[in-house]
Amino acid sequence: MATRKESTSTPTAPMASTSPGATLDSPVKQIQIEGLVVLKMIKHYQEEGQGSEVVQGVLLGLVVEDRLEITNCFPFPQHTEDDADFDEVQYQMEMMRSLRHVNIDHLHVGWYQSTYYGSFVSRALLDSQFSYQHAIEESVVLIYDPIKTAQGSLSLKAYRLTPKLMEICKEKDFSAEGLKKAMIGFEHMFEEVPIVIKNSHLINVLMWELEEKCTVADKHELLNLSSSNHLEKSLQLLMDRVDDMSQDIVKYNTYSRNLSKQQQQKHQYTQRRQQENAQRQTRGETPLPEEDVSKMFKPPQPPPRMDTLLIAGQINNYCQNVKEFTSQNLGKLFMAEALQGHNS
């Protein structure tokens, strides 16, 4: 029986290509996305997303000066473990070829991914986005949160890797010394790019007419508090990540103790060796042959620190989600209290 794969794979980065008007030396300062693309991403999750399962797809468009225009997208199909012959690169090329035949923008400009309660900061996302930005400098990743969107407000954010993190990933130096030298922390890993949703004039007129026809039965319903399930789940995920961080700290502390202990043993061995050679010299004996101390005392392998940074970044996301949720509810409570006092 076929079983679904876990959502750990990420879209494969395309070969480098640029569009007319692209300026590789200037960063992307704004993203303009068509409303149709947003609807396609939402539809993709509603059709194939199940709970915490992640859906992914490719973004197409072009670059105009410092603005990235996303005009179309297509999803990656959910394949099972039995689909060993599925080739993601071949699938992307066939889709782009089909879009080119119907005169639709077919240049890669990034990829999108859904998230479960803001859980998107991971090594898989980092590696995939690095591949995209390394091939096409203007590439972005769009993160769509269906949980927040279902509560009444569209949650769609665009991220890019910072130049510091790009250099670290190129050098592949994820040690504590390398990260310290680059002066990079979890707050300097991703940079958010502002998004502007663009619709045609006819769609704007239609939305204006629909807004005029829509009536709110009870305006006080807007003051209803959000469900506590969202807060409970966010706190649970936050505690899980704090536990992961605690385990990483224990591993690094163990490595530091072992390294210090080995350095002490190495120093003691060197001193004993020098004393013994001094005694042999006073007795007129030949000194002991020199030995490679570094081979005798091999330093322990340092644990990579990039995973710790990713965990810290995810903890920060959960904290921001909790802060946003509680601030909205507190605002509603104060507004309800003011209205109640005014009516009484």
Curated annotation (Swiss-Prot):
One of its GO terms (molecular function) is translation initiation factor activity. Its main location: cytoplasm. CDD domains: MPN_eIF3h. GO terms for biological process: formation of cytoplasmic translation initiation complex; translational initiation. It is found in: Cytoplasm. Residues 1-24, 256-305 are annotated as: Disordered. Residues 8-23, 261-272 have a biased composition (Low complexity). Keywords: Cytoplasm, Initiation factor, Protein biosynthesis. GO terms for cellular component: eukaryotic 43S preinitiation complex; eukaryotic 48S preinitiation complex; eukaryotic translation initiation factor 3 complex. It holds the Pfam family JAB. Residues 31-165 form the MPN domain. The keyword Transmembrane helix does not apply. Component of the eukaryotic translation initiation factor 3 (eIF-3) complex, which is involved in protein synthesis of a specialized repertoire of mRNAs and, together with other initiation factors, stimulates binding of mRNA and methionyl-tRNAi to the 40S ribosome. The eIF-3 complex specifically targets and initiates translation of a subset of mRNAs involved in cell proliferation. HAMAP family: eIF3h (MF_03007). Component of the eukaryotic translation initiation factor 3 (eIF-3) complex, which is composed of 13 subunits: eif3a, eif3b, eif3c, eif3d, eif3e, eif3f, eif3g, eif3h, eif3i, eif3j, eif3k, eif3l and eif3m. PANTHER family: EUKARYOTIC TRANSLATION INITIATION FACTOR 3 -RELATED (PTHR10410). Belongs to the eIF-3 subunit H family. This is Eukaryotic translation initiation factor 3 subunit H. It comes from Salmo salar (Atlantic salmon).
